[in-house]
């Protein structure tokens, strides 16, 4: 590949589980870094003090309002990035950090946390606690094709990313209640159980073929809403499903035998 894009990982208040999920791509991650992207910022992996110019910023974690450096960092990330991706449910919806009230070690004064979309404009949401390695990998490949691919590749990349861009436009709330209002109560649920399978705390069970949520267990991560095939209807993606999978597979295979 002639033109590699610049990708950065910006860590806010989170557990680093999303970065671990990214690393779980193993050879797929190496392939992306070899051929498609330069990792120009990542506090966990690289000694870079200041946020640089980036094509794609993967932001993990919510923003602590009492940590003024974090507030400035997220604003700086928006200024210096072409595409900002909320990586994981803490960045998308606040997740379990919404329940923080301060008093914890080592920063007892840190008591208020917001999803990044409450402070800046976000282009793409990747919900999940954590998101699957495959989803993160696919978004990275599609971001490259959107910025550096030919016209056909850019069109397919746009169609693939559209549902995740629509999630970003929807807002910063995500819980089983949204699934209940938008899907179940509208008669759209087909009882597939994907929402229950995606819940990281097992707050959703299937009762008589329909999902039932335990509000006391829900951590507001939005994984169920993002995973539900009926939470959005994207007629652009469905006819292109095979082409999109093929273009991702080809991108990851290309150049494997160049040694």
From Swiss-Prot:
Annotated SUPFAM superfamilies: HydA/Nqo6-like
Catalytic reaction(s) noted: oxidized coenzyme F420-(gamma-L-Glu)(n) + H2 + H(+) = reduced coenzyme F420-(gamma-L-Glu)(n)
GO MF term list: 4 iron, 4 sulfur cluster binding; coenzyme F420 hydrogenase activity; flavin adenine dinucleotide binding; nickel cation binding
N-terminal signal peptide: none
Cofactor: Ni(2+); iron-sulfur cluster; FAD
Keywords: 4Fe-4S, Electron transport, Iron, Iron-sulfur, Metal-binding, Oxidoreductase, Repeat, Transport
Disulfide pattern: none
InterPro entries in the cross-refs: 4Fe4S_Fe-S-bd, 4Fe4S_Fe_S_CS, Coenz_F420_hydrogenase_gsu, Hydrogenase_assoc-protein, NADH_UbQ_OxRdtase-like_20kDa, NiFe_Hase_small_N_sf
Domain of life of the source: Archaea
Pfam families in alphabetical order: Fer4_9, Oxidored_q6
PANTHER family hit by this protein: COENZYME F420-REDUCING HYDROGENASE, GAMMA SUBUNIT (PTHR42845), F420-NON-REDUCING HYDROGENASE VHU SUBUNIT G (PTHR42845:SF2)
Protein name (record): Coenzyme F420 hydrogenase subunit gamma
Source species of the chain: Methanosarcina barkeri (strain Fusaro / DSM 804)
Lineage: Archaea, Methanobacteriati, Methanobacteriota, Stenosarchaea group, Methanomicrobia
Gene name, Swiss-Prot/TrEMBL: frhG
């Amino acid at each position: 590949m002639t033109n590699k894009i610049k990708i950065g990982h910006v860590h806010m208040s989170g557990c680093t589980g999303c970065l671990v999920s990214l690393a779980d791509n193993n050879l797929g991650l190496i392939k992306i870094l070899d051929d498609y992207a330069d990792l120009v910022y990542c506090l966990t992996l690289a000694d870079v003090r200041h946020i640089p110019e980036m094509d794609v910023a993967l932001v993990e974690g919510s923003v602590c309002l009492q940590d003024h450096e974090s507030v400035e960092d997220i604003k700086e990330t928006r200024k210096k990035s072409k595409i900002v991706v909320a990586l994981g449910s803490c960045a998308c919806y606040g997740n379990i950090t919404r329940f923080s009230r301060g008093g914890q070690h080592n920063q007892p004064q840190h008591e208020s946390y917001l999803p990044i979309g409450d402070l800046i404009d976000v282009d793409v949401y990747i919900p999940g606690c954590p998101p699957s390695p495959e989803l993160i990998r696919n978004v990275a490949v599609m971001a490259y094709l959107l910025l550096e691919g030919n016209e056909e590749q850019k069109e397919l990349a746009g169609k693939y990313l559209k549902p995740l861009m629509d999630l970003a436009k929807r807002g910063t709330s995500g819980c089983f209640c949204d699934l209940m209002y938008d899907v179940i109560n509208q008669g759209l649920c087909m009882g597939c159980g994907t929402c229950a399978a995606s819940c990281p705390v097992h707050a959703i069970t299937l009762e008589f073929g329909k999902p039932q949520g335990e509000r006391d267990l829900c951590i507001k991560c939005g994984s169920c809403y993002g995973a539900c095939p009926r939470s959005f209807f994207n007629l652009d993606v469905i006819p292109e499903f095979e082409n999109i999978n093929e273009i991702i597979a080809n991108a990851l295979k290309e150049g494997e035998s160049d040694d």
